[in-house]
Regions:
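Flexible "cap/lid" loop of the alpha/beta hydrolase fold
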Residues: 139-171, 232
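N-terminal secretory signal peptides
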Residues: 1-9, 20-23, 27
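Active-site loop/oxyanion-hole signature of alpha/beta-hydrolase fold enzymes
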Residues: 78-111, 128-129, 155-156
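Conserved alpha/beta-hydrolase
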Residues: 65-83
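Conserved loop-alpha-helix segment in the C-terminal half of the alpha/beta-hydrolase fold
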Residues: 227-252, 259
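C-terminal segment of N-terminal export signals and the immediately downstream linker at the start
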Residues: 29-47, 54, 62, 66
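Conserved hydrolase catalytic core segment
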Residues: 114-146
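Active-site glycine-rich loops that stabilize anionic/oxyanionic intermediates
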Residues: 49-52, 117
């Protein structure tokens, strides 16, 4: 009897040990998967362009969040839901500070910083102040200013004249253009018309101060929307295409890529993150 009892106890112990080992193995696998998933998670800061707001990234942000990423879509002072703050004191530094402060107060690190159109001015300035926090920088059909340039320098002669007249009248902003100016897809015209707001003039009057921080970001990308003609964006794209330290993409789309092709934009952003 004693031998039989011992044999049963031994068998039970083996089974218990095996079960425990199995649970441990599953836990280890689960833990490894969690770590791997966490490693794949990125933090995106998406900066909009002229007359827009964080709202324009809604579709892209939703897609990124569903894939486990953290997303911030700050709206710049005087635009979108912050249009009530429009004033003549808003300049480029104001908008740079808007984004810098999100990064600072949220304690963000290893971020993918994206700037669309006018947002290229903003992220260029942001990189100067938060370079250690940026792991990837993306210019989405965006301006790429050089040190000392101001927005007015890159405007057309007609646009410069219109801004000059607006300043003489004491105006502090310029109305949002119709969606056809940006070649926005017709299905999104109503969305643009409902949300777009005036752009503060002061942001185009202040020269930017750069030391080349954006070039020191580890991963650099330029995305060109070929469905929108703009010599500034085309020149920026061609210059980066010839530079092996940059990745470049083209999308057959109007200027507002995040509105018209959010799925493709998200694919690219995940590739370059």
């Amino acid at each position: 009897m004693a031998e039989g009892v011992n044999r049963n106890l031994t068998r039970r112990g083996v089974l218990t040990s095996a079960a425990a080992t199995g649970v441990g193995t599953m836990a280890a696998i689960s833990g490894a998967a969690t770590i791997a998933h966490a490693a794949d998670q990125k933090t995106f800061v998406l900066v909009h362009g002229a007359s827009a707001g964080g709202w324009c990234y809604r579709q892209a942000a939703d897609l990124l969040e569903k894939r486990g990423h953290k997303v911030f879509t700050p709206t710049l002072t005087g635009l979108g839901e912050r249009s009530h703050l429009m004033s003549g004191s808003i300049n480029l530094d104001t908008h740079i500070a808007d984004v810098v402060n999100v990064i600072k107060w949220e304690g963000l690190e290893n971020i993918v910083l994206v700037g669309h159109s006018y947002g290229g001015w903003v992220i260029s300035g942001v990189a100067e102040q938060t370079l250690p926090a940026i792991s990837s920088i993306v210019y989405l059909d965006a301006f790429m200013p050089e040190d000392g340039q101001k927005g007015l320098d890159m405007n057309s002669e007609r646009s410069r004249a219109e801004i000059g007249e607006a300043l003489k009248r004491g105006e502090v902003s310029r109305p949002a253009p119709p969606p056809t100016v940006w070649n926005v897809a017709e299905k999104n015209h109503a969305w643009w018309n409902a949300k777009a707001t005036a752009q503060p003039i002061g942001v185009a009057l202040q020269p930017i101060k750069l030391t080349g921080a954006r070039e020191r970001v580890a991963k650099k990308t330029y995305i060109r929307a070929t469905g929108y003609e703009n010599p500034n964006f085309e020149a920026a794209y061609q210059k980066r295409k010839a530079d092996s330290s940059w990745r470049t993409y083209t999308v057959l789309c109007g200027h507002e890529v995040m509105m018209d092709m959010p799925e493709r934009l998200v694919e690219i952003l995940q590739e370059v993150a």
